[in-house]
Amino acid sequence: MIDLVPRDGRVIVPRAAYSGTLQLIRERARRGFFTVDEVDVENTVQLVGAVREADVVWIETPTNPTLMTADLEAVCRASAPLDTIVVVDNTFATPLRQRPLELGADVVVHSASKLISGHSDVLLGAVVTRDLPARRTFERRRTRLGATPGVLEAFLATRGLRTLHVRLDRAEANAKELHRRLASDHRVVYARYPGFGTVISFEVVDGHEAAEKVTASSELVIHATSLGGVESTWERRRRHDAEPDAVPDGLIRLSVGIEDVEDIWQDVQQALDVLGR
């Protein structure tokens, strides 16, 4: 994506984007490759206004981990008469829930390690584009840097892709029910779920120390950074300095798996019990 930005160009990125993405973009901006504007993706007026001044717009929708959603169609419509390139990280939505190219985006990226592969055993990314010059840029980069997946990774990702619809339907149904229950629990300050996907973000009472206690107390839900696998995982996100300031200090990101929803809820409940009943 960075190769698509002209020298001294401008990049738009969500304030609460994935920390690895923000780190890379901010580092390149500090080195003078381009300038960067960080925007609130849920403020459509601000976002569309920023598009008019940008060379590349990087959109996560939903964002990781705050689960903010952007009006992707409005962004693509605003960029269409311009030379602005719209890049969408579609990891959380997957092609089954959102198809950015059909809405007018130029490039779509996926962390295929997550829902597409679905078993927490692959390190792989995917880039999809309908833009021929962009494709040629990516192909040159792939050839020169050796960014080619191994045979085993390709096999495992293909295996996972075959069951994506089944896994996503089950995990999504679990996530909807867990969100409903979390939202009514008195120990939860708020719970956010965009209505699709497998990830819930929430905060508990008493701040980040309480969040650490909760996530360390689970037995079924794995205390880990990864997401999108068949197993449920969670963590407090602001454990590292690299996490964006827009991410609340006590935010817990719960990636919901395909286990029985009652088993997941029972474990979440007993973990929340460390805060009292």
For each of these PLM feature ranges, what is it?
Residues M1-R187, R192:
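Conserved PLP-enzyme active-site core in the AAT-like
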Residues S19, R26-E27, G32, E42, ...:
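PLP-dependent enzyme catalytic core of the Aspartate aminotransferase-like
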Residues A134-R135, L164, G207-A210, D241, ...:
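Short, acidic Gly/Pro/Ser/Thr-rich loop/turn segments
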Residues E177-A183, I222-H223, E262-I264:
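Short amphipathic alpha-helical segments with coiled-coil-like heptad repeat character
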Residues P194-I252, V256, Q270:
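Conserved C-terminal alpha-helix-loop-beta "cap" of PLP-dependent enzymes
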